[in-house]
Amino acid sequence: MVLRRLCSLVVALLVVPALGWAAPQGKIVIAQGVDPTTLDTQNQQETPASVVASHLFDTLVERDANLKIVPALAAELPKLVAPTTWEVKLRRGVKFHNGEDFNAESVKFSLERVKAGLRASSNFRPIEKVDVVDPYTVRVQTSKPWPTFTSIMAFRQASMYPPKAYAGKDTAFISRNPIGTGPYKLVRWSKDEEIVLEANDQYWRGAARIKTVVFRPIPDDAVRVAALQNGEVDVAVNIPPHLAKIIANHPKIFLSTAPSIRTLQLMFVTHEYDAQHKLVGPYKGVTADKRVRQAIAHAIDVDEIVKGVLDGKAVRTATMLTPLHFGYDASLKPIKQDLAKAKQLLTAAGFPGGMDLVLNSPQGRYVRDKEVAEAVTGQLNKAGIRTQLKTYEFVNYLNNLVYVHKPGPVWLIGWGTPTLDAETVYGPLFRTGSNLGNYHNSDFDGMLDQAQTLMDEKQRLATYHRINKLWIDDMPAVPLYQQVDLYGASKRLNWKARSDELIKAYDMSLK
């Protein structure tokens, strides 16, 4: 009896330290430039919201740190079982934060919801129906062959939702009450102040190593860096290049960089849309004329902006596709500044004496976005395009301009898509009727529709190369550069920046 008790005591002494070590501990603070517009991740198309959502929700598949697609809530990668049918086997034993089981009904509910008129719905348009085969198998029927199905399922907007908890609930309710299967649960969201998350002890992969994660919006670059230096935050995004050396030489913080999937561009309004994303007709402003758009493109010296504003921490692009994207064409070269050609195009468009223009830009969202917009404004003014710059806090920029099709005539935006495919660059921004579109070109739409259904990669790549050339000729946007993502982080963290801009506390640990 004594021996048995002694053995039990030894076992207890051995087990307790292991459990204590494994339990989530500590707190970190992550400073983003802006607060999310919503925590209903199916109803957003912005990275700050996706970063927070990646802690609360899981998707069927995801990209690992090397951007390779791997199973997540799916037990294995989806299989094409017919030309327009994808089968997905699901992981068992997973629960939502409220205790609801994750199963085939969850997938059916989530995919049907995300394609039904939400901000990201254009990415899920090919889904025709979702069939529940058994509790842990679904078959997704598509209206046409869909080669990017698996990569779209890694989209943060394809997050899985609990059908019982969310039945009949609107997006405002879900934004206030996010319930996922993710590694963290929401504790509170004090709008424009902080989002507090706590580790989910029942997470299917095992509990996170860090107990509490706080997101704080700090729009000002210098304030964000100062907070990092002072130890008020542990990770800071969008480090301005001119402050990178300070971080690199600081004894308690370090710089982590990654080539970004994001490009920055000037977008043009060429057509008008109503609030339901229906085409109204040609835009009545100056940017409806292709020659004006081309003149603006030739008036800008992007190389000088990259050198002078971004300290060389960016890469010129010929389109909105980076070398990381399927559809990228290395043979295409960026437009060089040509003031004579810009003036020639303006004269041909009926503006021999120049013209007046408004440029809208966010402030605090992208690396030195306001300064980039100011540099563009100065260059356009020198070229005879009298430009007035208006800057906005990012949430207002999206809600009051971009999401209601009133962003123009010219507006600065960044775009990064984790699918790494031209489909989710060109589709959401330029396809007729897309949620963010202010452009219409039936030839472009037809080629994009064709590319979206080609299962042969060579044919699909060739089609995107043709689309790239059409896009450059019609100039619905001026591609500026591929961003190089710069992060500052505390040396008490084990962490490395990713190229898809996600910051995952689950992958972090405290030293």
Name each model-derived stretch.
Residues 1-4:
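N-terminal secretory signal peptides that target proteins for export/translocation
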Residues 8-18:
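Bacterial N-terminal signal peptides
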Residues 23, 63-65, 91-121, 129-130, ...:
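Extracytoplasmic/periplasmic ligand-capture domains
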Residues 28-32, 236, 358-360, 481:
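Short, well-ordered beta-strand segments
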Residues 31-81, 112, 179:
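N-terminal lobe/hinge region of extracytoplasmic solute-binding protein
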Residues 82, 89, 122-166:
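Surface-exposed binding/hinge segments that line
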Residues 345, 487-511:
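Long beta-strand-rich cores associated with HINT superfamily self-processing modules
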